[in-house]
């Protein structure tokens, strides 16, 4: 045995993978797919027949779930694609800070203070107006591949 000590620095975070493999031919419209490293919702799928050389191909048109940008990809239908683990969680809105962060109440009674207000103008104004009126608001937070963003709002009545 060696007397040397080895220090290992792990660059990856522990825990579950951000994506899972799925065969391209089985991914359907309104499913999720990773295109160019971004989690996307599939809006259109078309398949081409097998050519003289090669496989049938799937043409995916998808929208980035965080930025709203349209992305496209063509993959042989027998190949595996990365599919993001997408979670949607509802939190009660407690406070909006002046620097654009929100304070949210989790199910177990803790607060979550690391999310910014959404960039979508109509959703942003609905949240600010509802909060200013003193309504009880519940925001829906979508998370995938290490990113989180507020993407919907529910009004559960006055406080």
Swiss-Prot record:
The modification Hypusine is found at residue 52. Residues 1-12 have a biased composition (Basic and acidic residues). Residues 1-21 are annotated as: Disordered. The keyword Transmembrane does not apply. Keywords: Hypusine, Initiation factor, Protein biosynthesis. SUPFAM superfamilies: Nucleic acid-binding proteins, Translation proteins SH3-like domain. Coiled coil: none annotated. Lys-52 undergoes hypusination, a unique post-translational modification that consists in the addition of a butylamino group from spermidine to lysine side chain, leading to the formation of the unusual amino acid hypusine. eIF-5As are the only known proteins to undergo this modification, which is essential for their function. It comes from the Eukaryota. Gene3D superfamilies: 2.30.30.30, Nucleic acid-binding proteins (2.40.50.140). GO terms for molecular function: ribosome binding; RNA binding; translation elongation factor activity; translation initiation factor activity. Translation factor that promotes translation elongation and termination, particularly upon ribosome stalling at specific amino acid sequence contexts. Binds between the exit (E) and peptidyl (P) site of the ribosome and promotes rescue of stalled ribosome: specifically required for efficient translation of polyproline-containing peptides as well as other motifs that stall the ribosome. Acts as a ribosome quality control (RQC) cofactor by joining the RQC complex to facilitate peptidyl transfer during CAT tailing step. PANTHER family: TRANSLATION INITIATION FACTOR 5A FAMILY MEMBER. Belongs to the eIF-5A family. This is Eukaryotic translation initiation factor 5A-4. It comes from Solanum tuberosum. The gene is EIF5A4.
């Amino acid at each position: 045995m060696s007397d040397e000590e080895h220090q290992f620095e792990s660059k990856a975070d522990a825990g579950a993978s951000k994506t899972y493999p799925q065969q391209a031919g089985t991914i359907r419209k309104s499913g999720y797919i990773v295109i160019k490293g971004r989690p996307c919702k599939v809006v259109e799928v078309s398949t081409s027949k097998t050519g003289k050389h090669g496989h049938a191909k799937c043409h995916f048109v998808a929208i980035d779930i965080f930025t709203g940008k349209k992305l496209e990809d063509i993959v042989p239908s027998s190949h595996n694609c990365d599919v993001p683990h997408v979670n949607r969680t509802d939190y009660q809105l407690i406070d909006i800070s002046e620097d654009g962060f929100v304070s949210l109440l989790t199910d177990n009674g803790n607060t979550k203070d690391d999310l910014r207000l959404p960039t979508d103008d109509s959703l942003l104004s609905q949240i600010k107006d509802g909060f200013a009126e003193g309504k009880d608001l519940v925001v829906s937070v979508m998370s995938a591949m290490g990113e989180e963003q507020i993407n919907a709002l529910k009004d559960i009545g006055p406080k």
